[in-house]
Amino acid sequence: MPVMNMISETVQSLYSDGVQRVGLLATDGTLQAGVYQQELTAHGIDTVCPTQAEQAEVMRLIYEGVKADAPAFDTTVIADMLVRMEREGAQRVILGCTELPLGFDRYGISRQNTVDPADILAQAAVLAAGYAIRN
């Protein structure tokens, strides 16, 4: 089995789908390192990132919501951010931290037009192993 890069697989999937602009949600460190942005730019895909206040709320969702196993979480800022990203032309939003899809599901945030890199990597691994993807 070849070594697979989740970021590369995610960006390649978006590129293959003709996506030209994406929103990117991730931890502070991932955003600051620019690992998604570099790969997206190399494929001609523009990135819409959270504002500073929105990013603080993304981090709160990850750490005070999902990791703390909080039973409830106010998702207003996250929902408004997704609307803003779409308004700014984002065709998809990458949930670039494994806790984000969990938080979206747990707290009822719509996953419409979101991309889970772990799902894309799993599908790529199945295909690389010579199997078909079942729906």
Question: Where do the protein language model's features map onto the residues?
Answer:
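Non-catalytic structural scaffold of enzyme domains
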Residues: 1-135
